[in-house]
């Protein structure tokens, strides 16, 4: 079912499609590999195009799979060159998360070589309150060796367990690489399960 195509870009919620159906949103700070992850998951070379300068993709990009299922590529930030725009992007994201009823799954990408960013932690807590399933992809896992990947995954899982032990929410953490394709199959399986539809054809 991974027949996906670009629909529109929006810098406010009023320009988004009607708030119905199901939306899977991808979020990651600048240079987290978010666009490459979307391309890899949906087997498209350039369905999601990353900006040449990190943090310059300031719009919500919407991709459609059918009339009721959309993929949302959210803007990321984190670089000083766009500090004046940070507040505008943050308000846009806050409005989307708090008011978008069709948002059903949040996928957060975090460079495996870094720690969880403060903003991403806030996103996770927000997702708890909204009861949205969260999938954390520790991206660029090909950049470190197997032992370091294993250790980092364990650290993230312990953090999640500590944070979510009293919360009733689905949350998963995987290592991921669009280069080595680490985690792609598991990600597809999880999304098939959480959406309760055959989003991806699995061999």
Curated annotation (Swiss-Prot):
Alphabetically ordered keywords of this record: Cell cycle, Cell division, GTP-binding, Magnesium, Metal-binding, Nucleotide-binding, Septation
GO cellular component terms given for this protein: cytosol
Cofactor list: Mg(2+)
InterPro entries: G_ENGB_dom, GTP-bd, GTP-bd_ribosome_bio_YsxC, P-loop_NTPase
Protein residues bound to Mg(2+): 35, 57
Top-level taxon of origin: Bacteria
Gene Ontology molecular function: GTP binding; metal ion binding
Database matches in SUPFAM superfamilies: P-loop containing nucleoside triphosphate hydrolases
Gene3D superfamilies: P-loop containing nucleotide triphosphate hydrolases
Biological processes annotated in GO: division septum assembly
Domain EngB-type G: 20-197
Similarity section: Belongs to the TRAFAC class TrmE-Era-EngA-EngB-Septin-like GTPase superfamily. EngB GTPase family.
Annotated function: Necessary for normal cell division and for the maintenance of normal septation.
Protein name in the entry: Probable GTP-binding protein EngB
